């Protein structure tokens, strides 16, 4: 499963990482930093810009299924997020068993949940 590596290679990698103190340069002039007052509080205004083309929605839509059945959890994103309604196994199960019309309790448990980000 795991291959043994030479300790010399590992020591060389560790030495290379040890030279990188802090992870990034704090001298970067292109990076914006929040200015703090004497109490340590900062304030910023975030402005949302319009999209480059008018066809894009200013938010993302995510459809998922999340439910507990037979003591086990099922939490997955639904392929209908991308318009593919046929490859989601839960949506297929709902359609095949016509849960909307036959078993509203189970349908309420397994139906798609839509969230907007």
UniProtKB/Swiss-Prot annotation:
Coiled-coil segments: none
GO-annotated biological processes: DNA recombination; DNA repair; DNA replication; viral DNA genome replication
Keywords attached to this entry: DNA damage, DNA recombination, DNA repair, DNA replication, DNA-binding, Metal-binding, Repressor, Viral DNA replication, Zinc
GO MF, one annotated term: metal ion binding
One Pfam family from the record: gp32
Binding residues annotated for Zn(2+), in chain numbering: 65, 78, 88, 91
Region: LAST, residue numbers: 3-7
Function according to Swiss-Prot or TrEMBL: Single-stranded DNA-binding protein that participates in viral DNA replication, recombination, and repair. Coats the lagging-strand ssDNA as the replication fork advances. Stimulates the activities of viral DNA polymerase and DnaB-like SF4 replicative helicase, probably via its interaction with the helicase assembly factor. Together with DnaB-like SF4 replicative helicase and the helicase assembly factor, promotes pairing of two homologous DNA molecules containing complementary single-stranded regions and mediates homologous DNA strand exchange. Also promotes the formation of joint molecules.
Family designation: Belongs to the Tequatrovirus single-stranded DNA-binding protein family.
Subunit details: Homodimer in the absence of DNA, monomer when binding DNA. Interacts with the DNA helicase assembly protein; a ternary complex between the helicase assembly protein, the single-stranded DNA-binding protein and ssDNA is an obligatory intermediate in the helicase loading mechanism. Part of the replicase complex that includes the DNA polymerase, the polymerase clamp, the clamp loader complex, the single-stranded DNA binding protein, the primase, the DnaB-like SF4 replicative helicase and the helicase assembly factor. Interacts (via C-terminus) with the viral SF1 dDA helicase.
Note on domains (UniProt): The acidic C-terminus is involved in modulating the ssDNA binding properties. The N-terminus LAST motif is involved in the cooperative binding of the protein to ssDNA.
Protein name according to UniProt: Single-stranded DNA-binding protein
């Amino acid at each position: 499963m795991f291959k043994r590596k030479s300790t010399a290679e590992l020591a060389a990698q560790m030495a290379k990482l040890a030279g990188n103190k802090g992870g990034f340069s704090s001298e970067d002039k292109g990076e914006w930093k929040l200015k703090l007052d004497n109490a340590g509080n900062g304030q910023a205004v975030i402005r949302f810009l319009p999209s480059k083309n008018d066809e894009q929605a200013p938010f993302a839509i995510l459809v998922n299924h999340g439910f507990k059945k037979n003591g086990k959890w099922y939490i997955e994103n639904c392929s209908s997020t991308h318009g593919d309604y046929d490859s989601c196994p839960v949506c297929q199960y709902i359609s095949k068993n016509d849960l909307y019309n036959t078993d509203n309790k189970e349908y309420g448990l397994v139906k798609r949940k839509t969230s907007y980000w």
